Amino acid sequence: TSFERHYLNIPFEYSFIYNHRNSERPFYDITDSTLWAHEVGQLSSLRGSLTQYMDWTNSFFSKNETYTHIPKLVVYYAWKDHKNEDKLWVQAELPVNIVQENLDYRRNVVDTAMNRRTAFFNPRLFMIYYPDENNRQYNQLKFDYRYNSWAQNLTYKINYMDTSNPLEVWMTNPNLPDSHSHFVGFDYNWGIPEKQLRVFFYSNYTYRMNSLCQSMTYDAATGIRTYRPETVNGNWTYYGGFNAS
């Protein structure tokens, strides 16, 4: 006598991630000094006396702390066949990424303290279906969907201009929107083990919204390139394949 069973499990999970990062770039302008008489390898030992040559406009010192809380509800569902093996497996992940960022940024002798709290819902749905219980290894369908959102680098919200390279100007953009992406994946595996016949097909598609990029403006009169972060829509990638053996 055949029978089918349904199983459902809904656990709650929580994870925490802490990240601390220090970075600095002291920039010195020794164009009109006698320091050119020293070998390059000797300059590091003279760092204490180099303060008077510090280019504060293009030097920065930053400290960044990130606290990430991820409460997540997970739904597991299984439809069993009469052999008590999975005929259909569904896994739905429902996490909320709550991120607290603290940035201490010093540039041009000005200290800037910024704080940002963001919360993003990044769900995922994964399914496996076995049409033939007698041929599970060579007959299965897989489906995967993921949605992700994230905020841009907090440093971009500080309004400054980097001119450390005379021919390149790097700007920030405090008005950058958040980025988002959709991913859809599909796999199909079929075969007859007795005849050593196997067919595999896969298809993956990703669509991105507000992808981060660098816009560039070139001034032909001065030869200066100006870069500024922007976001663009419509970026997508697709790859798939087919294999038979």
Model-derived features: positions:
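Exposed, low-structure sequence patches enriched in small/polar residues
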Residues: 1-245
